[in-house]
Regions:
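Active-site-adjacent loops and short helices of periplasmic peptidoglycan-processing enzymes
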Residues: 31-198, 202-211, 268-269
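Domain-terminus/edge residues, biased toward the C-terminal soluble/receptor-binding domains
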Residues: 178-182, 188-304
């Protein structure tokens, strides 16, 4: 059995203030406004693109986006923030939370079975049927490398079985104030796993409370032994290896219906921010958008 992974940068080294608000309107909107008044203000601001008092303009290619200051709750930028979209493997953050909530032994061996094979999209996996790995390793691979069979095995082995695990995911979403979020599986391969940028921001902030999710989702790589052979896995978000980025939590996602998605909590010039990018097309668009957000915030913070 492999030991629990230890990473050079302790993910718990950063303090955070969680402000999971009931909603995420721009700070330019007055508190207590009716939905109709808020919609009118948003129309005047443009096509559901709202920016804070930051003076420079940001343009992202992603279909929907939300950038939030964690400490203050300020919405720094939003685009189509209320649009309900498929979330692909961003789902795995919720899978991880309910698995950890269940407090099952993390060193317990879990077996990959025929039931974990992806017959919907026929995605490839190096975790062959019969592979046995500690629950901790499966959780790491699901978060770091977006390993679908790992996520499937985790939720299938949830107390009470698969249906109980998916029900727990939906209950957790409701408890976090995410009424527009729905889960039908634990991998994100199901096209009807949906959410909004605002609700994914809440999910990222909730996931940050779990040290294992912080550590595993930002691990650059990890090696496991599968049937006597070493298999090396890498993080699906290459930014975690970039020294100019200080990323506290990360998850990527992709299916055709969702496009390419990316959620992160990061420190930019010592400001903790949640970055949600949904429905990016092109292999590098979400990474380009994330770098544009970082550059924009650095300029804006320096000019304050």
């Amino acid at each position: 059995m492999l030991p629990r992974p230890i990473f050079s940068r302790p993910a718990w080294a950063f303090a955070a203030v969680f402000m999971v608000a009931a909603s995420l309107p721009s700070v330019s909107l007055a508190a207590g406004m009716s939905p109709a008044q808020i919609a009118a203000e948003q129309r005047r601001a443009g096509p559901d693109i709202i920016e804070s008092s930051l003076t420079t303009r940001l343009d992202v290619a992603s279909r929907a986006a939300l950038i939030t200051n964690v400490d203050s709750g300020e919405v720094l930028y939003s685009k189509n923030v209320h649009q309900r979209l498929p979330i692909a493997s961003i789902t795995k953050l919720m899978t991880a939370m309910v698995v950890l909530d269940a407090k099952q032994p993390m060193n317990e061996l879990v077996t990959i079975t025929e039931g974990d094979i992806d017959h919907l999209r026929h995605t490839h996996s190096r975790l062959t049927v019969g592979t046995k790995l500690p629950r901790a390793d499966l959780l790491l691979l699901a978060l770091m490398s977006s390993e679908n069979r790992a996520a499937s095995a985790l939720i299938r082995n949830y107390p009470g079985g698969l249906n109980a695990g998916i029900a727990a995911m939906n209950r957790k979403a409701r408890s976090l104030g995410m009424p527009n979020t729905r889960f039908f599986d634990g991998t994100g391969l199901h096209g009807e796993n949906v959410s909004t940028p605002g609700e994914l921001t809440k999910m990222v902030q909730a996931a940050y409370r779990y040290p294992d999710i912080r550590a595993f989702s930002t691990a650059p790589d990890y090696t496991v032994t599968v049937r006597g052979q070493e298999q090396h896995f890498r993080n699906t978000n290459g930014l975690v290896k970039k020294p100019e980025w200080e990323i506290d939590i990360s998850k990527t996602g992709f299916i055709n219906e969702a496009g390419r998605c990316l959620v992160m909590m990061a420190h930019i010039r010592d400001m903790p921010v949640v970055i949600v990018l949904m429905d990016s097309w092109g292999k590098y668009t979400r990474i380009g958008d994330a770098n544009r957000v970082k550059d924009w915030l650095e300029v804006a913070i320096n000019s304050r």
